[in-house]
Amino acid sequence: MQAPNIYPFSQTQPQALPGFTYGPPQLVFDHSAPRVDPLHSTVTINSPLPLQHYNGPNAHINSANNNYAYYYHHPNNNDNNNHSNNTIKNNNINSVLPAVNIQISNNSHYRNTHQIPSAPQRLVSIIPDPHMPPNISHFQLNNIHPQMHAPVATDIHFQQVPVYNKTNNGIGTDNINNDKPVNSNQNEVLDNIDERSCHEINRVVSFSKHFENNELTTTANDLNIQSTMDELAKLKSLSNSTHFRQSIATQNFHSLQNHITTIENRLASLLTDRQQEQQQLKQQESEKESSSPFSNKIKLPSLQELTDSISTQHLPTFYDNKRHASDTDLKSSTLHGPLYHRHAFLSTSSSSPSPTAGSAPLQKLQVPRQDDPNDKKMNISSSPFNSITYIPNTTLSPMVQTQLKNLTTSNLNTKKKNNRGRPRAIQRQPTLTTSSHFINNSNPGAAAVSTTTPAANSDEKNPNAKKIIEFCFHCGETETPEWRKGPYGTRTLCNACGLFYRKVTKKFGSKSSNLLLRYRRSIDLANDRRIPDFITIPNRFIHDMDNDQTLDSEYNTILQ
């Protein structure tokens, strides 16, 4: 794996600038600035070298106030000595700052050391660290930026500092306990900070342990809370580290304290959300337990209750499954339920014996319908089986059941066939002059067909029955072998007028094409000459009959 190019300038050999002299190659070791290996995820700290390694006026380096970041290149390990001597000779540099010849072995702590490309052996720049305030150590846990480092000898001690804000990397207890102390002067401020940090971390860890013992804590499946617990545990292990205790500063403690507060708030919010979820689950379970099926809410009456209700019932009523039921029937059916009608039928069948009760099957019995003079919505198509009451809990033989089923289906089919050829009842009479003329001038006996609804048990006619008018919308004919479709719907024209009815597509109005309806008059009367033989009705007017638009104004507009 090739090391990434993170150097501050290109790898090519730069040209010598006029008026600029190259200094001798030097190895710069900063005591406090961290060195981050690009191929590793841990941070390494260089220990201070003995003073004999530094020559010249730069020999005395104050490590406490050294707040500069040194950017340099890796020297070539193969020809370190020769290259340094040649550089001094070629550049004609004053030997005030001689190069330090440090034998660096090939067995370095870093991987891929020999794959790093060679670069000019000179000190590039010494600039202040923009991320740190003055007179503060460079070591910051929350703000570590990768910087380049030089390979050093194997006998130089390195310390690995655990990164507390990375939850994925585990921290071994052996590395923490085996840290070698660094020779540095500790003051009382660092001791106080160390005690405060340990106190805060212990408080947060105890807070997390309190929630671990609680029932509201999540299991190992909840990754968010589990990772927060691990992060707090790593904070406590970091506080016990010897190197962390000796290298922490005031600003670092404030950042650590803020981070602990953030983790504590996050843990509290996660646990609160978990508590709310469990409360919702408990509430849903309680609602499910309280809500029972519909059959459990309605208690079915017992046999004794049925007997008592049968003996105390009033006059019997029955269901009428006609399409147009009377108001009294609707009121009685809504006031009493189906169970009431079944009880009423049981009482009538048991109290009044009939000759057909023994021969007819028990599951389907006909109740004689009583004539009501106020019923104005009776229909001819009412069959003798319109009023049927089914007795529950009766078992019949399969042969009887099939016969009853076939009888019911045959009655329904015949009723549909009878209604197919009959025209619809006119609910809204049109405003055409033709239809109004024939309604007013035609014979009432021929134009108006009065139909009555006879009772099931008597042959007397009801004079208050509804009269249905059947006529052609075009010619007013009331008798025709077949009713045909017209502009006002199905079965609105007689057979003669419907034969001349046709649809054409013709341009009308602002639209490019509209469907126009055209039909021809079959009867031409002397008193109705103003209407031509052909009348064109736009389709949009026909479909808007339910709106406020009247057809008289539209006809006048078309005919003029």
Curated annotation (Swiss-Prot):
Molecular function per GO: DNA-binding transcription factor activity, RNA polymerase II-specific; transcription cis-regulatory region binding; zinc ion binding
Q: Does the keyword Magnesium apply?
A: no
Q: Where do the zinc-finger regions (GATA-type) map?
A: 472-497
Going by the UniProt record, its keywords in alphabetical order are:
DNA-binding, Metal-binding, Zinc, Zinc-finger
Q: Where is the composition biased (Polar residues)?
A: 428-456
Gene3D superfamilies cross-referenced by the UniProt entry: Erythroid Transcription Factor GATA-1, subunit A
Q: Where is the composition biased (Basic residues)?
A: 414-425
Q: Which GO terms describe its biological process?
A: regulation of transcription by RNA polymerase II
Q: Where is this region: Disordered?
A: 274-297, 345-383, 412-461
Ranges of Low complexity composition bias in the record: 347-361
* Database matches in InterPro entries: GATA_TF, Znf_GATA, Znf_NHR/GATA
Q: Where is the composition biased (Basic and acidic residues)?
A: 369-378
Any signal peptide, and if so, which residues?
none
- Give yes or no: UniProt keyword Metal-binding: yes
GO cellular component term of the entry, any = nucleus
Q: Looking at the Swiss-Prot or TrEMBL record, what is one Pfam family this protein matches?
A: GATA
Protein's recorded name = Protein GAT2
